[in-house]
């Protein structure tokens, strides 16, 4: 496939709208599909098995159209009212009556959720049982990728693969140099990547909601209020922090609005897009370079997550999406290939130690940190200041550095991930 077409195809697959945090959404989507396979039969039991990472990210995050958090209500709503054709927006259209029925399902203890002992990062298995039959739906590898479907013992789809520590795409883009991907994107026209601007508009709306209303722990709104008081400067860095955090404040509290996700994560989408919006507000950019910058950001996020995993013990918003935003801003400011490589090294050298301890309202603080580091790393590189190679995990090239980060994520953070989950489960009394 021609390089530009592969880039466009990848962007269209990886940059899609999502309603709610994508881990509980994946559970709801699996439940919705399993219920559709079961038809009108009355459910006697719903057995849900998820990977440790899905469990971790779904434990404390708000669910749209409810005032609740967690996988149980997400799964129950998927059974009661989810429509699988809505994909990652499966929870859109939920009404109060649906929530009441979902509560009845949970009260009757018909829904169970357990952790499946798998090293697969993204895995959701839903088994529904009725007096007259049963159904199974399994999602693996991506939040919306069904790999197994069965209806009363009849297998309808079987694409299950043996779990690996990270389900890596065979996309040849991720073996290329990032500078070559950027060069190709810089030649694309609006007719080819103009759709990138849809995500900018979508994520700006949710950021504005986070600024207008008290949601989550109000990280973005607090920055805004202190800018208004003159305590903080109304500059690029604070605007990037404010907008990015505000989007997460709203989203993690379960706001009934979609976000444009990136590589399977809504918060990654916010982090990949909103610092660029902040730059655009301070230093207006024409539509074409703006769309190109967004494409660079999303492609870089996908590139890094190819190596660290779509879910991991590292905060993908910080080290992947934040790096995408950072090099996009550097590119808009005229950075050449060497300075873009330097920006990547600065970001990874800064935020490689940021852990993921699940999706929750506190993520807004991490997104603010990532947005701030994105501006700082770009400005440092533009001024010729880059972390030297062999300082820690920083390699000779940007790609070497990303691969080193991947080794850290897959090998070094394996036990850290289990320890994080152990601590979280202990606090939940599980």
Swiss-Prot record:
GO terms for molecular function: L-cysteine desulfhydrase activity. InterPro entries: Ser_deHydtase-like_asu (IPR005130), UPF0597 (IPR021144). Signal peptide: none annotated. Transmembrane segments: none annotated. GO terms for biological process: L-cysteine catabolic process to pyruvate. Belongs to the UPF0597 family. This is UPF0597 protein Clos_2050. It comes from Alkaliphilus oremlandii (strain OhILAs) (Clostridium oremlandii (strain OhILAs)). The lineage of its organism: Bacteria, Bacillati, Bacillota, Clostridia, Peptostreptococcales.
